[in-house]
Amino acid sequence: MRVVGGRLKGRNMASPSSRDIRPTADRLRESLFNILIHAYDDPIADARVLDLFAGTGALGIEAISRGAAFALFVDNGTEARALLRNNVEALGLGGVTKVYRRDAADLGPAHPIEPFSLVFLDPPYRMKLAEKALASLRDGGWLTPGALLVVEEAKAAEFVVPDGFEELERRVYDDTEFVLLRAVTAS
């Protein structure tokens, strides 16, 4: 697994040893970031990024590599947080990232954390955790008005967009679906 674009392009990231963590494949990550940059006026530059169900941190690290100002990684798994810390340290990203142990589907209030303009959600497939996490983001004040969110889910999961979000598009790659959303109410 490697960083596919930006200033860290080509740098390796630690991969999980267990099947409990499912990082976004390099090819899919590259496609997703091309969509964000070319179809959504590059929401990455100087963004505050939130990477929920972060696993290895590949999505947030990719955003930092491409110009995001800050990334917060949230995962409650012990192996995931160890991988995250390893990747952050190996890539020299300690000053622009934080790793939180928290349930991404039950975040609570964001205060005193500043809200985020770009959010990645890559929950375990077919567990309906994305919908819960989106409601938690909305209700807890984690999002800037108009924040862009990307949900990665199994195509077969039949993801339903909760209130407070506008569906912008869906892209399917094999058995994976990216759903791009916009926060429509200030949180």
Predicted feature locations:
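Class I S-adenosyl-L-methionine-dependent methyltransferase catalytic core
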Residues: 1-187
